[in-house]
Amino acid sequence: MKVFPIFGRRSRSAAPIPARGAGRHAAPAFDDSADDQASYDDTEAWTHETYDGDADGAAYAEPAPEGSLGAHGLAKTYGGRTVVRDVSLNVRRGEAVGLLGPNGAGKTTVFYMITGLVKADAGRIELDGHDVTHLPMYRRARLGIGYLPQEASIFRGLSVEDNIRAVLEMVEPDRRQRQRDLDSLLEEFHVTRVRKSPAIALSGGERRRVEIARALASRPTFMLLDEPFAGIDPIAVGDIQALVRQLTERGIGVLITDHNVRETLGLIDRAYIIHTGSVLMEGKPDAIVASPDVRRLYLGEEFRL
């Protein structure tokens, strides 16, 4: 499935960014249609909604605290086969969390339910304690959930700087501030020297840096990284790990799913191991690697960090 990039948004408030000088409830500058305005109004209302339980009256636990992205009791069934059952996890701002497990375990389905690409059959997804379970992907993005797909998502027909500028133009109305933000992102992610280069000419590592810089142009509070090490040369692995650390140093919460277990465990603070559709274990990398069950069912007895 080809997925185009969905970006986060400028701040942690519920509304898209209005033009400078406008009130909080003014229509955002980049929403021109009535359909977009209706979507915006719906998104504005989410902070005032409450959720008392599912359709059967089952109550959920108290909402997660502000500064967190959480999933509670997620379940998914395809054709009578349950692939995810009662999965709960939490990511706090400023930490990197791995979502790992063997092929077919259900981790990708869990990840896609959190991004909004797959609809959950049961359970609840919360951002800063508010229910976003039924919001589509683009509205979650407006609220601060950024997503970087596995596939190359860069705009290949644009230069490096125009890739980033395209997002800044949606969220920053002041031209001079946009230029300052652009220069800052180019410098921070070490792509200033290729700013005029066509995106199609970038190496794998350069492309990832530009994609992350472009995603950050909208100031997300959480980033969901789908296979960030896919298609990356071994020499660039450390580069990607450093980029993830830059995100957490900015106070951004990061959720990573990847088949490159060693590289992922080398940069995250915690991990959830999914096995046969459920959470087998949650813990720090050292505890994960030391777990007899995780080694027997997933890592193998000879695995070492």
What are these regions (language model features)?
Residues 100-102:
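The feature captures the beta-strand-to-loop junction immediately N-terminal to the Walker
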Residues 115:
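Helix-to-loop junction immediately C-terminal to a conserved catalytic motif
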Residues 176-194, 241-245:
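Conserved ABC ATPase "signature" region
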Residues 198-202, 206:
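Conserved ABC ATPase signature
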Residues 219:
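Conserved catalytic motifs of ABC-family nucleotide-binding domains
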Residues 223-227:
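Catalytic Walker B motif of ABC-type/P-loop ATPase nucleotide-binding domains
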